[in-house]
Amino acid sequence: MNNFPRRGEIWLVNWNPARGSEQRGKRPALIIQNDIGNEKAPTTIVAAISTSIKFYPMNVKIEPHESGLHDISIIKTSQILTISKIRLEKKLGQLSEEKIEEVNQAIKLSLGLENLN
């Protein structure tokens, strides 16, 4: 891969083969790893994206105009995975800095770095 993924980009990921309740098939994911790691490592860290809308504090809603996706979706920061960059098929979109800040807050909640109030 010549162009490495960058934090805040949405990529189509080939999740196969999946195990248990992991994502399956080809689905979008948000790159959440820092860009130094994205440039140097053979892996990246992503958060799964789904059109199955469930409003939990760890989920971030994204509209099509914000994401490059066709449907209203959620970023599931409770499903953070390290994947090989070989699984990345194509870039679909880029989040705004404001939306990335929402994701940062949701990650803190998901990892227990901040309390739910």
Task: Please provide the spans of the model-predicted regions.
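Conserved functional hotspots at enzyme active or ligand-binding sites that engage polyanionic ligands
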Residues: 1-117
